[in-house]
Amino acid sequence: MPMDIIKGNLDGISKPASSSRSRPGSRSSNGSLEVLTPEPGSVKIDMVNKLNSGQEGHTSNSGVEERRNSNDAKWADDSKTKPAKESSDEDPDMPQPQATPEHSDDPKLEETNAVLQNAIRKMHRLDKLLAKKQCREKEVKKQGLEMRVKLWEELKSAKNTEDLENDEELGNTKKFLCLTSESAGKAAAEALHCEFEDALFSVFHTQIPPETYENLMEKDFTCDVEKNEPLIITEKQPFSNTEAIEPRSEDSQGFIRQNAEHSQDFIKRNIELAKHSRSPVVMVEGEKKRLDELLQGLDDADSGLSSAEGDQCGWLVPGEGYTLAATESQQLAEIDIKLQELSVDSPTIFSLESQSHKGDMECDANEERNTEPTPGEKILRDRKEQRDRESRLRAIDGKLKELSEQVEECPMITPSKRNERITWRWLLAKILEPE
C-alpha cells in the first residue's frame, strides 16, 4: 500500500544504525540488509489526524509508539524461541555464526537480522547433511570395490581349483574370465589398497569440497557476483578457486581430455572417409585391416576341411575350366592299360583314339587359357558344359541299357578267353565312344 505524505515532518521515521550501512562492493560488510516497506494504514490515519490537530496527533503518535514497542517484544520473543528450536537439530561441533551487535531501536532491522540468522543456520545445517551424504556415498563405493575384488579372487580360485558344482557353472565362469580382462581385477585391487580418492562431482559449481568444509567454516567467505565464483579469504595464506577444488578438477580434466580425443578421432575418421568417397565401399584403414583378418580366418577355416572336399576343390582352378582330378586320371590310365592288354588284334585303334582324345582336351585347355572370358561368358560356358555332360551321361546310360538287353537276349555260345576279351573290348569301346 503506497503512503501519501501531504504535509508534515519525518522525525518519527527511525534511521538505520551507522554500523548496518555498507557499500555493495566492500568485503568487510556484515550480513544485515535494510528492507524498506511502506507503513501500514494506521500510520497514514495517524498522520492525517496529526495534520488536523496537534493534540490529537500527539496522542496518535504515542499510540503508534506503544504498538511498535509491543511488536518489538513479540519479534524478540520469536527470535529467541526459533533459534532454540533449530539449534537442537544442529550438530554441537558446528560453529554457530555470531551476530554483530547493532545499537538500533528499529524493529524492522531486528526482524531482518533474525530472519537472516535463521537462514544462515539452516544453510549450515543443510551443508552438514550434504557432507554426511557424500561421506556415505564414499563408503558405499569403497564397499563396492571390496566386493569386486573379493568376487575376482573367488573366480580366480574357482578357475584354478575347479571345485565348482557342475560343468555349466564352470563353463560360464571360464567365459566370464575370458571376456573380462585381468586388468579390471588389478585396477580394482589397486584402487582398494591405495587411498580412496574423491570421485564425486559437485552439484553446484559454487559448492565447497567436503574435505575443506570443516576447516573453512570459521573463515570469512565472500562471493563475487560478477564472476559467480566463490572467493575464499584466509588469514594466513590466500589461495585461488582452482586450488580449492583441485581434488575434483583431476577427474573433470580427464573427462574433458577423453572427449577431446574422441572428437579428434571422429574428425580423422571423417577425413579418411572423404578420401575414399568415390569407391563403392567406403572403409578406413582400421576397418580394412579388420576385414583382411576376418577373411584370413575364413581361408584358414576352409583349408581345414576334409581331404575329400580338398581334393574336389583342388582341381577346380578359376579361369582354366573343368580339369580331371588326380584319381580320375589314374583310373583312366588303368583303363588304358587294360585296353592295351585286351586289344591284341587291333592295338592301334585305341591308342589313336586315346591320343586324339588327349589332343582335343589339350587344345581345348589351351584355347581356354589363351582367351580370357568375361564373367558373363564364363557363366554361360559353364552352363553349356554342364548341359553337355548331362546329355552325354544320359546317352551313356541309354547305351548301357541297350547293351545289357542285347547281352541278356544273346548269350555267348563259345566261352573262350579270346571271345571274352573281344566282348569286353567292344563294351569298353562303346562306353568310351565320343558322341
Curated annotation (Swiss-Prot):
Polar residues bias: start-end ranges: 50-63
According to the UniProt record, one GO cellular component term is: acrosomal vesicle
One GO biological process this protein is involved in is: mitochondrion organization
Q: Where is this region: Disordered?
A: 1-109, 354-393
List all Low complexity biased stretches.
Answer: 18-32
- Give start-end of the signal peptide: none
Q: Where is the composition biased (Basic and acidic residues)?
A: 64-87, 355-371, 378-393
InterPro entries hit by this protein: Fsip1
Q: Which Pfam families match?
A: FSIP1
Q: What tissue expression does the UniProt record report for this protein?
A: Detected in male germ cells and testis.
- The coiled-coil segments of this chain are 108-154
User: Which UniProt key words apply to this protein?
Assistant: Coiled coil, Phosphoprotein
Q: Which residues carry this modification: Phosphoserine?
A: 87-88
Subunit relationships = May interact with AKAP4.
Identify its protein family: Belongs to the FSIP1 family.
The protein, known as? Fibrous sheath-interacting protein 1
Report the source organism. Mus musculus (Mouse)
Q: Which gene encodes it?
A: Fsip1
